[in-house]
């Protein structure tokens, strides 16, 4: 199984496992990326690049061509399905749907659905949340598997 990583997985890892203190962890992440087990969305690249920090530099050094999945036609078809689901869900406020459409989240769900990836995120499902569309809720609606980083490490039998 291949995995697609949410921006928050990289950012939270940067904060909780700084590169200077956890070099083995970051080498293992680079190994997962280079083995073709892990991908991300081109929208995630944009979000990480905005940071302009050591994570931005690390990603430039470790993300090979093809790591960031482009918004190909199959992804855009699924993106339409994701957005139709969000817009038809009466729980969400209009600003929540607008934000969901503009950040990487909807594209991540669409890419996972189109490519058969499991989506890796730190978010937790909350189908009653009005102010934000949560990735796990969108995954559940589209039948996409989601999990956390530790699940991926276990499934790929990676230890630090």
Annotate each language-model stretch with its function:
Residues 38, 66-69, 146:
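Conserved beta-strand scaffold positions in the cores of enzyme catalytic domains, especially
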Residues 74-136:
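Active-site neighborhoods of divalent-metal-dependent phosphate/nucleic-acid chemistry enzymes
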Residues 37, 113-116, 143:
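Residue-level detector of structured alpha->beta connecting loops
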Residues 1-61:
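Short, well-structured N-terminal submotif of metal-dependent ribonuclease cores
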Residues 44-85:
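Short, surface-exposed acidic-centric catalytic microdomains
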Residues 21-24, 28, 54-58, 74-81, ...:
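Exposed alpha-helical structural elements
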Residues 118, 124-160:
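Acidic, PIN/NYN-like endoribonuclease modules and their adjacent C-terminal/linker elements
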């Amino acid at each position: 199984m291949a995995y697609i990583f949410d921006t928050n997985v990289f950012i939270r890892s940067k904060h909780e496992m700084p590169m200077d203190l956890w070099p083995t962890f970051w080498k293992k992440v680079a190994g997962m990326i280079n083995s073709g087990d892990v991908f991300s969305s081109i929208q995630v690249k944009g979000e990480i690049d905005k940071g302009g920090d050591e994570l931005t530099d690390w990603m430039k050094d470790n993300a090979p061509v093809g790591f960031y999945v482009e918004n190909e036609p199959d992804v855009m078809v699924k993106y339409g399905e994701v957005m139709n689901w969000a817009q038809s869900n009466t729980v969400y406020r209009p600003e929540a749907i607008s934000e969901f459409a503009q950040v990487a989240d909807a594209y991540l769900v669409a890419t996972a659905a189109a490519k058969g990836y499991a989506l890796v995120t730190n978010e937790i499902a909350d189908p009653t949340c009005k102010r934000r569309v949560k990735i796990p809720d969108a995954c559940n609606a589209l039948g996409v598997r989601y999990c956390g980083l530790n699940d991926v490490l276990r499934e790929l039998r990676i230890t630090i």
